[in-house]
A protein has these predicted regions:
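Generic cytosolic/nucleocytoplasmic N-terminal low-complexity/intrinsically disordered segments
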Residues: 9, 57-58, 104, 158
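Short hydrophobic targeting helices and cationic amphipathic motifs
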Residues: 3-5
């Protein structure tokens, strides 16, 4: 188990309604462990017909892969990699000053042949803070819709983005990179 890690991230941007970006959120050694795990050939990915939402519009680019770390219906844990991820989730929980991890999963979207914006969605209707930690070098942006204005967040390796989870948001499939990998989590 990895213990005793500290947050090294620096607050880069603060937008309205709690949209925040932290560059180099994790220390290099811990981030590299997580990156090697989820980008490696042995990590267990599970196929989703629509990575953003349960209902599918049958668009060929909606699909993706995920791996649950904390499932909302199984809060005691759902992965054999719990020891790798729990320190990270606890650090984010402290960063956003919340008491509970509602859910967390690793997500991967694949390269698209043309620009593809996934479905806008809210992870939960209840009050929560959403967090995204970017794992790999990629070009698939995150778009957060605030007051009908799109805030475009460019992915950077080891950058954490936190925001009000009641805001509609989405991601874009990469065009220049084979895949976009991130850890998405929510806290109340």
């Amino acid at each position: 188990m990895i213990l005793g890690l500290s947050i090294h991230g620096m607050l880069l941007h603060y937008y309205g309604r709690m949209i925040r970006e932290y560059k180099n959120f994790l220390n290099i050694s811990y981030f590299q462990e997580i990156s090697n795990l989820v980008c490696g050939n042995e990590f267990a990915w599970f196929y989703n017909e629509n990575i953003s939402y349960k209902n599918s519009n049958n668009n060929i680019n909606e699909h993706g892969f995920s791996h649950w770390i904390v499932h909302p219906n199984r809060p005691d844990g759902t992965t054999m990699y719990q020891d790798y991820f729990m320190p990270l989730l606890l650090m984010i929980k402290d960063c956003v000053k919340r008491n509970k991890i509602i859910r967390a999963r690793v997500d991967m979207t694949m390269v698209a042949t043309e620009k593809f914006v996934h479905d806008y969605h809210k992870d939960f209707e209840q009050e929560n803070i959403a967090a995204i930690l970017y794992i790999n070098e990629t070009d698939g942006e995150t778009i957060i819709l605030e007051n009908e204005t799109e805030k475009i967040i460019k992915p950077e390796v080891n950058k954490l983005v936190t925001f009000d989870g009641n805001i509609s948001h989405t991601g874009c499939s990469p065009l220049k990179n084979k895949r976009r990998i991130l850890i998405n989590s929510n806290y109340e």
